[in-house]
Amino acid sequence: RSMAYSFPGQVTNDKYQYQYMFGDSLLVAPVVDVTKKMIDVYLPEGNWYGLFDNESYKSGTHTIECLMGELPVFVRKGTILPFNLNEKLELGAYVGNETESYKNLTFRIYPGEGVYLWYDYVNNCEVEFTSSTDSNEIIVRGLKIPVTLELIGKVDTIRVNGEDICGT
C-alpha cells in the first residue's frame, strides 16, 4: 500500500512517493535513482528497525546509506517475522523451494505490544506469540518443533510453553 493511503496526513511530500507498506509491519523504500548512495526515508509514527542491519529508528525523516543492490526495508516495533533460513541463519540466502519442511525455522522478534498467531501447516499446529511492554516479556505457546528465536532489542523474560528459556 502507498504511504499516503497507509498514513493519511503524515506523508504529503512527493519525495516519498515510492515508499510503500508491505503488510502492516514492513516499510519498503526502493532506490529509484541508481546514482544515489544516500536516500531520504520517512518513517511514520512509532519505532522502527532496519530489517538487514537491525538499527533502531524513531519516526521522522532519516538519511540512509544505500549500497548498490540493497533494498531498504524497515520493521515496525512489535512485529514477529517467521523466516526459513539456511544453516548459517543468513537472511536472504538460498534455502531451496521445498514447501513441506523448514531448513531452520527462525522467528525474528521485535519486542513491543501485541499478539501474533502463526499457523504451522507442516506440523498442523498454531503458535501464539504474546509480547508485552508492561511485563517486558515474550510468551510463546503451542510451539512443537525446534526453532530459533532471534530477539531484536531487550526483554526480561522469554517463556516457551510455560518454561523460561531466557531471563536477565
Give, region by region, the residue ranges found by the protein language model.
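Catalytic core of carbohydrate-active enzymes
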Residues: 1-154
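Short strand-turn-strand beta-turns centered on an Asx-Gly dipeptide
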Residues: 44, 160-163
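Beta-strand-rich ligand-recognition modules
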Residues: 164-168
